[in-house]
Design a protein with these regions (language model features):
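Outer-membrane beta-barrel pore domains
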Residues: 1-138
């Protein structure tokens, strides 16, 4: 079992964007916190659950596409993956590693709101996504 977390704090200077009328503020901040837990059975089959929360400074021009003018988004991510080749038994050589998986992201808030975030009735859950992936390392 593995438990990971991360916090990212980002500051942007937007002097040029503000001069061009693309941002209201000359600087904004963006913060992101993520925590996830993973379990791998025999290093072959894995399940990961992640909670994420992103928030930042409002700006009426930079985030003009949503009614809250905020970048705030939060939700859960679920991932199920398998590693058929990762322990030296690959037909393509001992160093070939392959992981296949599926990932689902469930948004609670998107662009500052759970419902009608864009003023057109869109819900945060309209951005939920499913991703199928293959990861290869050699």
């Amino acid at each position: 079992f593995t438990l990971d977390s991360r916090f990212t704090y980002e500051q942007q200077r937007l002097d040029a964007s503000q001069s061009l009328g693309l941002a209201t503020n000359d600087h904004v901040a963006l913060k992101d916190f993520r925590i996830d837990g993973s379990y791998y059975w025999r290093d072959k089959i894995g399940l990961t659950v992640q909670a994420f929360d992103t928030w930042g400074s409002p700006d009426q021009l930079l985030y003009a596409g949503n009614r809250t003018f905020k970048p705030d988004s939060s939700g859960l991510l679920f991932q199920l993956d398998g590693t058929p080749f990762g322990d030296g038994n690959s037909p393509l050589g001992k160093r070939f590693n392959l992981r296949l998986g599926i990932q689902y992201t469930d948004y609670f808030t998107f662009d500052g709101s759970g419902a009608n975030y864009d003023g057109l009735g869109s819900r945060a859950s309209d951005n939920n996504t499913i991703r199928v992936f293959a990861w290869v390392a050699y």
